[in-house]
């Protein structure tokens, strides 16, 4: 059964740039070189809103980037299955764009722009590996195996009576204070 993650209107759109996308790809790869060590993603905070349906309170950037990586891998390996979907409360066209990235529409919408750039970064990352003399198909197979076998998601689901907006605000306030205090 496929999980559906619902991005509520209080969240900004997808905004990861090249450095964040490459860091995630490199972290997954480097971890794979350590012979099966698990790689734990930062927590995904969700609230159940139905059977296999979740409000995505925190972790949208990571989950979307993983979705884009899997989309790229599926282009190379048609047997790749993406076991979740991402929908948006106020940006319904973003869901469609994520399903079928059209680079000619990249400039139509800020979400499209960042999604297309992230996908291009992913393509470029795999192509660079290929230029280093490795077989693209082999690279994709190894990466997909690593992703499935050793990448773990830290899943946090608060109590049902906790408001998603409140939790999102608290999580981001803590991050904001931490960043401010580090200056």
Name these PLM-found stretches.
Residues 1-183:
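Glycine- and hydrophobic-rich flexible loops that cap the catalytic core of alpha/beta enzyme folds
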């Amino acid at each position: 059964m496929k999980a559906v993650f619902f991005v509520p209107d209080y969240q900004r759109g997808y905004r990861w740039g090249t450095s964040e996308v490459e860091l995630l790809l490199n972290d997954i790869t480097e971890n794979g070189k350590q012979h099966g060590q698990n790689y734990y993603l930062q927590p995904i905070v969700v609230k159940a809103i139905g059977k296999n349906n979740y409000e995505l309170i925190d972790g949208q950037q990571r989950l979307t980037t993983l979705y884009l990586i899997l989309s790229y891998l599926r282009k190379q390996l048609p047997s790749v299955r993406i076991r979740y979907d991402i929908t948006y409360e106020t940006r319904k066209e973003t869901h469609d764009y994520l399903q079928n990235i059209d680079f000619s529409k990249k400039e139509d919408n800020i979400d499209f722009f960042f999604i297309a750039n992230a996908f291009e970064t992913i393509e470029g990352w795999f192509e660079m590996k290929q230029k280093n003399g490795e077989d693209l198909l082999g690279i994709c197979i190894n990466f997909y195996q690593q992703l499935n076998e050793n990448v773990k998601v830290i899943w946090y689901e608060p109590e049902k009576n906790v408001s998603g907006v409140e939790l999102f605000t608290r999580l981001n306030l803590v991050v904001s204070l931490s960043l401010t205090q580090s200056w």
